[in-house]
């Protein structure tokens, strides 16, 4: 089975169509106002509408959301997965799953072997895990910073929950990232952009081809 791909930070229909036609397995929209990739719920609904009957999952990315924020988005947008990319505790992850009846993918910041061990508190609690690089000091967002971590930290690790690799992936490094980490799914945002917050159709196509080719 080939490695799955999530294209995150989509803001318009055209980029969504490119990702779907190129073979993306997940599309992601960011609901975090400080991000250059933030979209309003109505806009996200238009992005996800491009999926139609295709076998592609809709992922909503949130950072320490309140139930009110989640409700506001879910009133307008059908999601298949809620991605929590902030400092949510294991009990908050359980609460979100329970309150909204949707699978939760918990993003976990990795820099050292200790960070990998700390992530185990979320294994089985979250439906899926997403390993991303720890953001640099002073960063204005906890992800989407085009920073990679040492993929070998994940080599031969074993998890009950399915997991994805993220953080600084791009057309040049994604094959090595898959080989070293042993991941079965990758997530990219910055690496398929022409400039911050602006996706490049050409890079989306090249990235997916590099993963699946
Ligand atoms: O993309 C963002 O702006 C963002 C904001 C807040 C939290 C996470 C964010 N992005 C996610 O971070 C990882 C890695 O992204 P990158 O490829 O290094 O840019 C990925 O899951 C993004 O969706």
Predicted regions mapped to residue ranges:
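Conserved N-terminal beta1-alpha1 strand-loop-helix module at the mouth
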Residues: 1-185, 190-213
């Amino acid at each position: 089975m080939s490695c799955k791909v999530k294209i995150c930070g989509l803001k318009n229909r055209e980029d969504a169509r490119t990702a779907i036609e190129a073979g993306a397995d997940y599309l992601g929209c960011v609901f975090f106002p400080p991000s250059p990739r933030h979209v309003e719920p109505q806009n996200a609904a238009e992005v996800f509408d491009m999926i139609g009957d295709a076998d592609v999952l809709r992922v909503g990315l949130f950072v320490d959301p309140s139930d009110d924020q989640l409700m506001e988005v879910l009133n307008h947008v059908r999601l298949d997965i809620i991605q929590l990319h902030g400092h949510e505790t294991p009990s908050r992850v359980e609460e979100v799953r329970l309150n909204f009846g949707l699978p939760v993918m918990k993003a976990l910041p990795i820099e050292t072997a200790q960070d990998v061990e700390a992530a185990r508190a979320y294994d089985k609690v979250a439906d899926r895990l997403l390993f991303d690089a720890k953001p640099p000091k002073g960063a204005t967002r906890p992800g989407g910073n085009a920073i990679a971590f040492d993929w070998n930290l994940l080599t031969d690790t074993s998890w009950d929950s399915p997991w994805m690799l993220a953080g600084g992936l791009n057309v040049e490094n994604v094959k090595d990232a898959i080989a070293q980490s042993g991941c079965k799914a990758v997530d990219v945002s910055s690496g398929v952009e022409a400039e911050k917050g602006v996706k490049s159709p050409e890079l989306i196509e090249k990235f997916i081809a590099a993963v699946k080719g």
